[in-house]
Amino acid sequence: MSVLTDLIYGGSHAVAGLTEGAVNDAIAKFGAEKAIAFPDTAYFFPTIYAATGVKVAKLGDLPACVGVLKSLITDQEDLGQALNAGLATAVGAEIIEGLKYLDGADPYAAETGIGFVPDPVIRSLGVPLVTGDIPGVAVVLGKADNAADVVSVVKDYQSKGILTFLIGGVIDQCAEGGVKMGLELRVVPLGHDVTAVIHAVTVAIRAALIFGNVQPGDLPGLLKYTKERVPAFVNTFGAIDNVVVSAGAGAIALGFPVVVDIDLGENQVPGALESVLDHSLTVKRSLELRNIKIKTKELPIPVAFAAAFEGEIIRKADMHTEYWSGKNATAELVLMRDPSEIEDHKITILGDDMDGGEKNYALCTFIEVAGAKMQADFESVIERKIHAWFNYMEGVMHTGQRNQVRVRVSNDAFAKGLRLKHFGEVLYHMIMDEFDAVVDKCQVTLITDEAAAEKFRDEVAMPRYNERDDRLLSMTDESVDRFYTCILCQSFAPAHCCVVTPERLGLCGAVSWLDAKATNELNPQGPCQPIFKEGCLDERTGRYESVNKMIQEATHGAVENVTLYSILEDPMTSCGCFECICGIEPVSNGFIVVNREYKGMTPVGMTFGE
């Protein structure tokens, strides 16, 4: 037996023994009928459920699962068989972690890690994953010989928007090294025990069930989906024992390559298990192994800029400056201009900068753009991006839109030199990068003088908002000559396609008809393609020949017919990025609507997840 397979089998046998003993002890203490479950999930023990279809609901269900686990450990001198033993380790880790939640326990209450990741969190990751705001998932475990190495790697992942899970001593090393952590910052500590790695694994597995329509019990389908659709990888730091190696084999079986920082010599498996001893190359090689390409944005600002900072919360005690509509005039407005009316890259500040000595200021953000292909309909599309772009700056928190805005700047960001001119630079560079197909010139004006801000809000911004609202209210499905497809989610749900109309947003809620129109203008070969309204077959249900034809093409034949307005006749497809489910309750001949946050049973006998 090779050194590598010997380590894998040694680890899987150790975990199998621990698992069997833990299950027997739990049954002896609580009885076989004792209920067991992970919190806030509809997928039971997700690894077991996805791989076998077994719904673990009580302790008495676990001995059979242990039997399946042990059957995967064959001790054969074959790498494929050894990888199956790695999957057995994953099953064992899931059972061991699940037992921690027995009797309503909260095993991570006193831990730095969060433990099990609830279903709503995974569903909330759907949109950023498919849009590329989260380009990949890193699982970092162990304890680095030099804490600075893992801190540097994790900060690099964070700056690139990679969702990073931490397991083991690296959690404390990153905390001490100043890494900002939390679900909202995309660096998530899971737990110190090596078995906590299963909480990262089940995120990938539930993604297959939620977004990919993989059926429970379809192990080949699950492995195919995670390998092809979930851009995850593993980094280990420090010495590794046979349990870590076996857990790594389970990751490789799911299609996730493993990069270690010790020399494995001839035990390396190119493309799957590799040694990278120079930590400055760890990130680069990890991304290469999953073919993750990241478009870096070098902006002339003194703080980091990444999607990972979008969820950063700035408390009042940590705040240097606030721009808030509750105290001062605020507005955000984009207007189309003739090219002769504006000066490209001109950034003007009317009033005091944030170093003027006050805590609270007015802030009206006025962006003027010009371009041969620019349309007034695109103004609001660009405007809504201000929220994301401001939040991408480390140390900046933005909420709201239009004339109801709150922006906070942290003491730390101010100390690093962040000023309003940098806000203008961010807006200019991001508009010219993301909207270069329609914008040729852009100038930015930031107004902090209270009188000037009030005048701008009342005389310029509000009338324009009202004009847009009046137009949107008059826009119906009948008033346009085309709809749009949206297949952004096909990276996770390959048979899904939305039909976006003026009266029907994309299922995720993030793509309006105007968004789809702008997306098509910006990228004519992209995810949003026009569907000209031709061949109306049924006005009542919204059935069109042209829509059916486009749906067939977009779903590669998986879906042949769609209606726009019927819940019973060929309703539109869905993936997992929705907030609510609407269904029919036959007894009362009525409809029910359930949101994903609701954890209870619905009148139709199913939970949201079911």
Functional labels for PLM-detected ranges:
Residues M1-H387, N403-V407:
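Acidic, serine/proline-rich low-complexity intrinsically disordered regions
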Residues Y9, H13, E20, N24-A32, ...:
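Cysteine-centered metal-binding/redox modules
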